[in-house]
Each structure stands twice: as structure tokens, then as C-alpha cells.
Amino acid sequence: MRPDISNIPELPGVYLMKDISDNIIYIGKAKSLKKRVSQYFQSSKNHSSKTRAMVRKIADVDYIVTESEVAALILEANLVKKNRPHYNIDLKDDKRYPYVKVTVNTKFPKIFITRRRLMDGALYFGPYTNVKPVRQTLDMISQIFRIKRCNRRVDGKGKRACLNYHIDRCYAPCNGSITPEEYRNNVMEAVKLFKGETSGTIKELQEKMNIHAIAQEYESAAVIRDQIDALKSLSRQQTATAGNDDSDIIATASDDETVFVQIFYIRDGNMVGKADMSLSWGDATGNIARVTEEFIKQYYQDAPVPPEILVQYPIPEKELVIKWLSEKAARSVQIQVPQRGNKKRLMEMAEQNAQMTLEQSHLKQSDKEQALQALLQLRDALALSTLPAHIEGFDISNISGTDAVGSMVVFENGLPANSKYRHFNIKTVKGIDDFAMMAEVVKRRYTHQKAEKDKLPDLILIDGGPGQVSAAMGSLKELQLDIPLVGLAKRFEHIIVPKDGTDEVVILPHTSEALKVLMRVRDESHRFAVSSHRRRRTARLSHSELDTIPGIGASRKKALLNHFSSIEQIRHASVEELTAVEGISKGLAERIVAHFNKERVENQ
């Protein structure tokens, strides 16, 4: 049934199409609301299939009158962003220039990077074209001002402080170690850096760097040098304004469902960065020029507007969009289609990158579909009640029981989720006992999961035979957890399934995709266990008594051990012998001798 549109005025504004359930399904803007809305209900021969489908669902039309076309364009963009109607072109993954956000409107403010600038009472700095020095500055702020960066709630309930507090990178407001007033003062000191007031901090850092350099502590000096460079880069970005050679190049590539957008950021005539985004076609299937226009309207709501925007094709309402962008930027803005020269070459490069992003998306989708089929096969082969979308794999690595480490890897939808990997330094088992080590690791993992009420895996895979499987099952039974668990032994790739106190062996063809999933999880857990064990062993071997002597870092320790071969020889070396080593000054040699002399006296 056609909605009543007789009372819609012939004025500029925004119209909202609603379905029978009063859901907004499309938002548009018009110079004349009455004329534009009427067009939807006239002959449909010029409408796309999606537009015809949308019109059939329209049960009501609401509208908002604005003072001008530009005001209508701005309101339309804001309403689309807020409501995300089904038939509008939807910017899916909006990767904008980063800002630094300071939540000054909270009791204990945080400082962090964000891609969106909201009207939420917080303080924002940026946008920054280069995020690396911003991250370096935030790391430095953690060291100097000890500002909270984790997501813990600060509710005054006296939580135990996290690691950042113990390494002097946070004042731990979560457990009341600092008052709100003291903490806020610290935050406002840090804020000065983002306001460009960096000269005092840079001067202090340069003095510290010189002290380390004089003491030949070159590694410490290099760290401070990098901090100074980051601050200078941050300051340059903060004070930079758009120059005449600044432009954004927007290119697209598309398939039947999605439009992939590539933006090249050109600043001072040089390419300083790029971003990939994607949009749905909405009701504009096949009309790249219109999709590009909609992208510009959504993207530049809160992204910095350069003097020039280069596009592949002329956009439908170019003059209106230019007027809006120029008002927003408070200067002239141009939208051009490059015809020749360097700009044309850069556009072709952006088009090529957009096409590559499209092809990579197709490959990823194909990988996901193959992984799903493999998981379905695995579910059937092991007679699981649910799809094993979340698999956790365990392995143990040690040398004769020393530096023993257990690993846990996570696969989600058949693919590794690296950020969720964990390693466990073995604590309770002495000597060579892989079974007991496996029992410890599994128990520690799921004791924590049970206590935190975290989601449990759909399947546990143990790298090993019946002994390891039995040990792991024992831990699960102790915790009263019923999680499907299997083992995969390397030699024959037989799957061990514990059932009612016995082990059932499932043999799958080596070509089976289900078996390949388990092998990938098993091999990854083994790799991660070995690498974790090596790190632990290296850390133990590299730690020595020299680490307790001020002025000896990694490079000097290495030089001393290369020269003397052992700590014992260094212990009995004279000042003259020590100064023969590159990087060891007379003062440092005297400190080394004094350290070992003191040790000998204490041991007498």
C-alpha cells in the first residue's frame, strides 16, 4: 500500500523511508523533498532491482526540513551513520587517521589512540598521519607520568595492582595508590606534550641521554634518543597545516556485493600513508560514481579535509559536495578526476591496490569456506555434538626436565588466533615427567577459565599419545569439566579418543581435511612450545651475576664473557685486565673488582 506523501513540502531536507515495523530502511536528502520522494513511486522502469525491492517495503515516509541543501547533506550523513539503514551505502570498516583521546571527563582519565572523534566531552588531539611516533609517545608517557592504560574499572574496591604498577608504568588508581587529584595533575602534565609544549621534556631527555652516553651506556642512550625523535615528530604533526600539495586519492574496485576503497594520502607532494575500506552497494548497484560520492560524504564527516580530492569518475552532485567540504574546511576544496601526469599515475596505482584488496578478500573468503567444510568433517569424524569452531591445543617442551614450558594455542573457525596463545612455565613438576606436566598445564588453564566463567573450547587437542591424553583427562575430571578431548600422536597421525576409561583410535586418510585441521593445531602447539622453551632457557643462561653490577648492559656483558670466557675468570681479573675489554672504562672496571671483593668478604 502506497504511503501518503501529499503533505511533504517542496523544500530542502532529509527523508526517512520506513517499513511496516517502523524501521528506517533508507535515508536520503533532496533539494525538493516532495519532488524527490514522488520519484520513488512513479514508473519503476528506471529503478534498479534493489530500489524496486525497497519501494515495495516502504510503509511510511518521514522527513526533516533544513535551511539549505548543504545542511540536508550534513544531516543525511549523520543520520545514515547513526541508523545504518539496510538500503543505504554502508561504510563497513572505517579506518581513519588516528587521534589521541584523553578522557578528562572521568575521575581517572585515560590516554589512548582512537580512530573516531566523538562529541563526548573528552579531549582530542590530532589527527596524525603517522601513528608510530604517537605510540612511542604514549609508551614514554607510561614511563614518565605512569598513566593508566589498561581497561580495568576503577571503583575503589582495592583490586590488586597489575604488572604495570610493579614495573613503575602506572600509579595503580585501581587500588587507591594515588588520589584522583594527584592522578589528574599527572594527566594534565602529559597533555602538554600533545599541545606541542615539548621543549622542556625534550631538554630533560637530552640531559639524560648525555649522562648515559658519557657513562658509555649506549643502549639506554639510544632508547632516549628514539623518545626524543618521537616527540619531535609528534610536534611536527600537531602543528602541521594542509599545504597546497595535499590531496587524497580515492579509487575503487568492486564485485557483486561489495565496493573496496583505497585512499592514498598525499601530503606536501609525498605519499605519507594509505587506508583500505569497504562499502555495501546499498541501492546503487553498479553506480561507482554515486558510491564514491556517498563514501566522501560519510568519510569526511570527521576526517581531515585536504584541499584536493581525486576520484576516478565525476560524482553526481559534485558542486554541492564541494560546497559542504569547503564550509567544513573553511577554505576552498576541489574534487577532480586526474587526466595526466603524476596524479593520473597515482590514481592508477590506487586502482591497482583496490583491485588487489578485492582479490585478497576473495581468497580469504575461500579460505573461510574451506575451513568450515573441514570443521564439519571433523565434527562428523569425532561424533561431536557441536562444530569445533574453537579448538585449544597443548604441548610440552623441555630438555631433561629443565626450563619446562607448556604451550596452548587457539584456533577459531579453523584458523590460528595468535593473540590468544598462552605459555605456562612448569611450577610443580621436578625432573622428567611429561604426563604430570601436561596435567599441570591443563589444570591451570581451565581452573582459570572456570573461575572467570570464560567460554570453554569446543575441542581440546593434546600433542601426544595415551599417557598425555590420560593426564589431561584427569585434570578435566578433577575440575568436573566435560570438554571433548583428543590426542594426536606424530608417528602414525592416529587420533586418540578417550571413552569410558578406554582409548578409541580413529584413523582418517592422510588426505582428510579434518585430519589436516588437527595436524595444523598440533604442529602449531609444538612450535609455540619449543619457541617458549628456548626463550626461557636463553633468559636463564643470559642472566648472570654481572646483571647486578650498575653500568653493565647486554652489550658489555657479552664483551666481557667473550673476552674472559666465564664469570669465574672475570671474578679474578684485575682493573688493568678488565679495561682491556672494549667498552669497559677504568671506573666501571673498579666497580666490577669492588663487587667481587665484597662478595669474597661476605662469603668468608
Curated annotation (Swiss-Prot):
User: Sorted alphabetically, which keywords does the UniProt record give?
Assistant: Cytoplasm, DNA damage, DNA excision, DNA repair, Excision nuclease, SOS response
The protein's location, in the record's own words, is:
Cytoplasm
Pfam families for the chain: GIY-YIG, HHH_5, UVR, UvrC_RNaseH, UvrC_RNaseH_dom
For this protein, the record's Gene3D superfamilies field holds:
5' to 3' exonuclease, C-terminal subdomain (1.10.150.20), GIY-YIG endonuclease (3.40.1440.10), UVR domain (4.10.860.10), UvrC, RNAse H endonuclease domain (3.30.420.340)
Return one GO MF term.
DNA binding
UVR domain: from which residue to which, for each copy? 199-234
One GO term describing the cellular component? excinuclease repair complex
A GO biological process of this protein is: nucleotide-excision repair
Q: Which InterPro entries match?
A: GIY-YIG_endonuc, GIY-YIG_endonuc_sf, GIY-YIG_UvrC_Cho, Hlx-hairpin-Hlx_DNA-bd_motif, RuvA_2-like, UVR_dom, UVR_dom_sf, UvrABC_protein_C
Coiled coil residues, start to end:
none
Residues annotated as domain GIY-YIG: 10-89
Q: How does it assemble?
A: Interacts with UvrB in an incision complex.
* Entries under PANTHER family matching the protein: UVRABC SYSTEM PROTEIN C, UVRC/OXIDOREDUCTASE
Family of the protein in this entry: Belongs to the UvrC family.
Task: Briefly state the protein's biological role.
Answer: The UvrABC repair system catalyzes the recognition and processing of DNA lesions. UvrC both incises the 5' and 3' sides of the lesion. The N-terminal half is responsible for the 3' incision and the C-terminal half is responsible for the 5' incision.
Q: What is this protein called?
A: UvrABC system protein C
Source organism per UniProt: Methanococcoides burtonii (strain DSM 6242 / NBRC 107633 / OCM 468 / ACE-M)
